[in-house]
């Protein structure tokens, strides 16, 4: 007798000895019932029920055990295992398949987890009483279009914020009356919004931007009903939910700022009041005045240290080296002109990329050169110098000149060189460009007070031209020259 294949052998081994076709089984049940109804009726209910269900609708056969049995038969034929070991291998394989490779087990677990989540969510919604509101909101959103012509991201973000408002805020209700859907809240007074008309009003405003040069009547664009909806939804939006550059984004930003400044956190105040009462402070007026002082008064803080980025440090060192080289080439040139010459030599792309930092740095250099030339020269030559605290805010102080009696001499070592105590001839013309400002920084405390000194310094700074103003004036002159016709004298005269 030829050896059977493992698959055929498994099929023969898995057949039941008393298996009968479905027709015979159904006929047997019906004939038993017809011939002797009492015999079948006297059997237990579960036995009769299983027999009827199996006869009418047989259960689905599972070929897993046949496949496992075929594998075991193949192992036995290949002499990988002995015949007496086949039963143990078959049982172990069935257990492993049922534990790790059962799609039914995995799907049942997934369904169980999903059912638990839905039950928890339903319980939470029932406790808040907002299940009907969410159902009504979903019905309203189903009437809205899924896409809009402009501002799709703003449209989706606003709808998500509305859904979050209704799901998280208590004392909110969404209901339908006739063809309209309404949103009602009673948290701070009863307020009702017609959602249908509000979204009809907003349908043409998603993604619309306005220009400051073209003013428009904003009251004509939105109805009071729509503005109330924006006010209620505003706390649940931000600049990423609705673009802040759009018309609706500007309104939502204004509403958020207004609500943030106007409303107080009652929970925080009640907690502070409870703590104060626990410590023996029962005076509510004193507590309120203390809180108002803590909230309204701003303590004076010291300016923070300036931490430069690697790019800013590179720009600072480059400008220091450029000023030092320019001073070495022209040692008798004035400080403001040397700084302007350094700025004029900068590459336009380099200046535009670091314009803010360069402007602040050159302004500090201008002040240092005017008030203390020796300090200015020291920071230019110091390769480890960094701006002082308050550099960006302007809240800093420059070191004063130690010897105010020394005169500045432009004819010797330059405008910012170390002052020399030499007597200047009064008959020679004074070439010092800061001569008119010396009196403002003299030691004559009896004649001029500190207020006049600062006023003189402000006037001095106001009359000076920055490097940007000089560049703009130069561009205007070049444009004026280019607008004229250089060949006008060659044209024929009529």
Swiss-Prot record:
Residues bearing PTM Phosphothreonine: 268
Self-association state and partner proteins as the record states: Interacts with hexon proteins; this interaction tethers the peripentonal hexons to hexons situated in the facet. Interacts with the penton protein (via N-terminus). Interacts with packaging protein 3; this interaction is required to promote correct genome packaging.
GO terms under cellular component: host cell nucleus; viral capsid, decoration
Function: Structural component of the virion that acts as a cement protein on the capsid exterior which mediates the interactions between the hexons, including the peripentonal hexons, and reaches all the way to the penton vertices. Two hexon linking proteins IIIa, one from each facet, stabilize the unique edge interface between a pair of facets. As the virus enters the host cell, hexon linking proteins IIIa are shed concomitant with virion acidification in the endosome.
Superkingdom of the source species: Viruses
More details: All late proteins expressed from the major late promoter are produced by alternative splicing and alternative polyadenylation of the same gene giving rise to non-overlapping ORFs. A leader sequence is present in the N-terminus of all these mRNAs and is recognized by the viral shutoff protein to provide expression although conventional translation via ribosome scanning from the cap has been shut off in the host cell.
Induction of the gene: Expressed in the late phase of the viral replicative cycle.
PTM note: Cleaved near the C-terminus by the viral protease during virion maturation to form the mature protein.
Name of the protein this chain belongs to: Pre-hexon-linking protein IIIa
Chain residue ranges for the region called Peripentonal hexon-tethering domain: 1-101
Coiled-coil stretches noted in the UniProt entry, renumbered to this chain: none
Keywords: Capsid decoration protein, Capsid protein, Host nucleus, Late protein, Phosphoprotein, Viral genome packaging, Viral release from host cell, Virion
Cell location: Virion; Host nucleus
Modified residues (Phosphoserine): 439, 456
Region span, Binding to hexon-linking protein: 132-245
Species name: Murine adenovirus A serotype 1
UniProt family annotation: Belongs to the adenoviridae hexon-linking protein IIIa family.
InterPro entries: Hex_IIIa, Hex_IIIa_N
Pfam families: Hex_IIIa
Site note Cleavage, residues: 483-484
Propeptide feature ranges: 484-494
């Amino acid at each position: 007798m030829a050896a059977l294949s493992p698959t055929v052998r498994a099929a023969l081994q898995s057949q039941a000895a008393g298996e009968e076709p479905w027709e015979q089984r159904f006929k047997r049940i019906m004939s038993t019932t017809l011939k002797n109804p009492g015999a079948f009726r006297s059997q237990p209910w579960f036995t009769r029920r299983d027999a009827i269900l199996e006869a009418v609708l047989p259960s689905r056969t599972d070929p897993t055990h046949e496949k496992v049995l075929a594998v075991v038969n193949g192992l036995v034929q290949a002499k990988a295992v002995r015949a007496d070991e086949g039963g143990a291998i078959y049982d172990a394989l069935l257990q492993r398949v049922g534990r790790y490779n059962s799609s039914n087990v995995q799907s049942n677990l997934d369904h169980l987890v999903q059912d638990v989540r839905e039950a928890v969510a339903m319980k939470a919604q029932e406790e808040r009483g907002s299940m009907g509101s969410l159902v009504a909101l979903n019905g309203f959103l189903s009437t809205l279009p899924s896409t809009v012509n402009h501002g799709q991201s703003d449209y989706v973000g606003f709808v998500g914020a509305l859904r979050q408002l209704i799901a998280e805020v208590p004392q909110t209700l969404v209901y339908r009356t006739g063809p309209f859907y309404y949103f009602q809240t009673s948290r701070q007074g009863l307020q009702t919004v017609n959602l249908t008309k509000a979204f009809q009003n907003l349908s043409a405003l998603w993604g619309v931007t306005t220009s400051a040069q073209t003013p428009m009547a904003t009251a004509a664009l939105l109805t009071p009903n729509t503005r109330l909806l924006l006010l209620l939804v505003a706390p649940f939006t931000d600049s990423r939910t609705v673009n802040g550059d759009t018309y609706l984004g500007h309104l939502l930003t204004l509403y958020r700022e207004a609500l943030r400044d106007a409303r107080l956190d009652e929970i925080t105040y009640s907690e502070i009041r409870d703590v104060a009462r626990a410590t023996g402070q029962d005076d509510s007026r004193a507590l309120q005045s203390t809180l108002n002082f803590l909230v309204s008064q701003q303590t004076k803080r010291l300016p923070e240290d300036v931490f430069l980025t690697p790019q800013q440090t590179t720009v600072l060192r480059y400008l220091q080296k450029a000023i030092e080289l320019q001073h070495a080439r022209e040692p008798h040139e004035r400080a403001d002109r040397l700084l302007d010459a350094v700025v004029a030599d900068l590459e336009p792309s380099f200046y535009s990329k670091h314009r803010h930092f360069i402007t602040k740095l050159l302004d500090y250099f201008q002040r240092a050169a005017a008030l203390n030339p020796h300090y200015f020269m020291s920071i230019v030559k110091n390769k480890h110098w960094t701006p002082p605290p308050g550099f960006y805010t302007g809240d800093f102080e420059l070191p004063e000149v130690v010897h105010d009696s020394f005169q500045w001499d432009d004819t010797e070592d330059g405008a910012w060189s170390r002052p020399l105590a030499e007597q200047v001839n009064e008959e020679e013309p004074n070439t010092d460009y800061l001569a008119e400002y010396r009196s403002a920084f003299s030691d004559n405390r009896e004649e001029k007070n500190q207020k006049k000194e600062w006023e003189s310094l402000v006037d001095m700074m106001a009359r000076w031209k920055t490097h940007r103003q000089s560049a703009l004036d130069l561009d205007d002159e070049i444009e004026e020259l280019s607008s004229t016709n250089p060949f006008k004298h060659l044209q024929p005269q009529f």
